[in-house]
Regions:
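Sec-dependent N-terminal signal peptides
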Residues: 4-14
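N-terminal "domain-start" segment that seeds a small globular fold
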Residues: 20-48, 70, 80, 188
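Extended hydrophobic-aromatic, low-complexity segments
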Residues: 27, 48-49, 58, 66-71, ...
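Conserved redox-active cysteine motifs that mediate thiol-disulfide chemistry
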Residues: 52-53, 60-77, 81, 86-96
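Alpha/beta-hydrolase fold active-site loops
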Residues: 54-56, 112, 162
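Short, internal strand/loop/helix patches
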Residues: 115, 120-169
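Thiol-/selenol-based redox modules, centered on thioredoxin-like
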Residues: 160-190
Length: 190
């Protein structure tokens, strides 16, 4: 009886510690809250939680990944583009889009924030790439450490390439790698 109780207590401790580790290192799943992301932007630390209540286009890039660099350049031009989604009367139109997590409608006053996160180990490399690619430095963020970059890559399943995600106002992941038309519609609200 005593051995059984010790065994049960040991299993409870084991499962409790395993579930805590899973919570700390959970992966992004559609329709669920995104993993924690904290980045540095112009000397300040910013948490993804600070964007609660807003739609977020979360884009990861690295200086050594030409595809993600081209995506950043394309996204920057879409954000700076003055075009908006308008209906025939010239008023801002509602945006409707479908994702694997559900169907969404963004009203006329919906704001979309863009968070571009660089995963380079070197801040100097990022700064040089921002300069070379003519990106606006104030819109670019970076991870604080190589360990953070590794954790984020794992949490967002980016082992085979960097990606862009759409997060709803409740902090749930609703879309990965949106096509250009969806991205243009979303970014017309930024």
């Amino acid at each position: 009886m005593k051995k059984t109780m010790i065994l049960i207590a040991g299993l409870v401790v084991l499962f409790t510690s395993v579930s805590a580790a899973v919570d700390d290192h959970r992966t992004a799943r559609f329709g669920e809250e995104t993993p924690a992301v904290v980045v540095e932007q112009q000397g300040s630390r910013i948490s993804l939680d600070a964007y609660r209540g807003k739609w977020v286009v979360l884009s990861f890039w690295a200086s050594t990944d030409p595809v993600s660099r081209m995506d950043q350049t394309r996204m920057a031009s879409m954000v700076s583009d003055d075009s908006t989604a308008c209906d025939k009367s010239g008023n801002d139109a509602e945006i409707e889009f479908r994702t694997s997590a559900g169907n969404y409608t963004l009203g006329n006053n919906t704001q979309v924030e863009v968070l571009s996160v660089n995963l380079d180990k070197s801040p100097e490399m990022m700064a040089e790439t921002v300069r070379l690619d003519n990106l606006q430095g104030s819109t670019q963020s970076r991870v604080a450490s190589a360990a953070d970059a590794e954790r984020i890559c794992k949490a967002f399943a980016m082992e085979k390439g960097l990606r862009t995600f759409v997060i709803d106002p409740e902090g749930r992941l609703v879309m990965a790698d949106p096509d250009e038309a969806s991205l243009r519609l979303l970014l017309s609200r930024s």
